[in-house]
Amino acid sequence: YIDGDKGILLYRGYPIDQLAEKGDFLESCYLLLYGELPTQQEKNDFDRCIMQHTMVHEQFSRFFHGFRRDSHPMAVMVACLGAMSAFYHDSIDITDPHQRMIASVRLISKVPTLAAMAYKYSIGQAFVYPRNDLSYAANFLRMCFAVPCEEYKINPVLARAMDQIFILHADHEQNASTSTVRLAGSSGANPFACIAAGVACLWGPAHGGANEACLKMLQEIGSIKRIPEFIARAKDKNDPFRLMGFGHRVYKNYDPRAKIMQKTCHEVLKELNIQDDPLLDIAIELEKIALSDEYFIEKKLYPNVDFYSGITLKALGFPTE
C-alpha cells in the first residue's frame, strides 16, 4: 500500500521503516508471500528452506560462457531467469498454487547466486559457491567479492546495508516491472518467464536503472566545484538536464525508503572510511545543497531511494553498470 501524498509505504499493513529496522529481507519475503509475519519457528523453517536451495544447476556455469565479458548484467539476468524454466520442470505450471510457491522459493534463493555469477563472469573471476550457514545478504556479498585465494570476512554493517536494500526494493505496489510480470502471467506463461520479463522492464532507466543513471549524472558533474552549475541547469525550464535521484512520481512528500536508505548510506560510508572517492564526495555535497535549497524544498524534490542506493552500492564495491 502506498500513500504518495503522506509518504507512506506499507507491506501487508506493516510500515516499511519497521520492517527495515527490526526485521530482515527473508522476513519481508515471508510476509509478502503469506500475508502475515512468521513466528520464530516459521521464520527458522523458511530461512532454512531458502538457504538450502541457493545452488543452481552446474550447467549454468557453461551457460555464462555464451556471453561476452562486457555484456550488461541485466541482459545476462534476463537470459538466466528465462533459462530457469529449462532446468526446473516441476515448477512451471502457473495455474498450480503449489508449483507457483516452489517457483517463488527457487527464485528468491537462486537469483542472488545467478546475479553474483554474472558479476564474477564480467570481471573474469571464478564463480563462488553459496554457503548455507550465512545470512541471505552476507551470502550474496561473499559470492560477489570472495576469491579462492583468501578467506572472505563478513562485515556486519555492509551485510545489514545489503539486506536493507533488498527489503526496500521488495515491493512497490503496481510499478512497471510488477505490471509486466502480471501481464506476462495473464497469458499463462511460466513463473520464470514472467520474472524474466519483469527484469527486462526493470532494466529501463526510468525504473530499476535509475540508480545507475544517478551515478552517471554524478560522473557528468565531475567535481564539487561544478555542482552550482548543474543545480542552475536543473532549475532552468529550457534546459533538458534533469537532476537524477531527486523527487518521485508517486511520493509528493519524502520517499519513506529514502529516509532509511540515507541512514544506511551514511553508516556504510562511515564504516568504510571512504575519503578519496570523488564521486561519493560529489554525492554528499549535492545532497547537502539540495536539502537546503529553497527551490528543491518548495517543489519537494528530496533525494529518493535511487540516489542513496546507488551511492551505497558503489561504496559496497559494485560497479555502476
From Swiss-Prot:
Pathway: Carbohydrate metabolism; tricarboxylic acid cycle; isocitrate from oxaloacetate: step 1/2. Keywords: Transferase, Tricarboxylic acid cycle. One of its GO terms (molecular function) is citrate (Si)-synthase activity. It catalyses: oxaloacetate + acetyl-CoA + H2O = citrate + CoA + H(+). This is Citrate synthase. NCBIfam families: cit_synth_I (TIGR01798), PRK05614.1 (NF004126). It is an enzyme of class 2 (transferase). GO terms for cellular component: cytoplasm. It comes from the Bacteria. InterPro entries: Citrate_synth-like_lrg_a-sub (IPR016142), Citrate_synth-like_sm_a-sub (IPR016143), Citrate_synthase (IPR002020), Citrate_synthase_AS (IPR019810), Citrate_synthase_bac-typ (IPR024176), Citrate_synthase_sf (IPR036969), Citrate_synthase_typ-I (IPR010953). The keyword Cell membrane does not apply. The keyword Metal-binding does not apply.
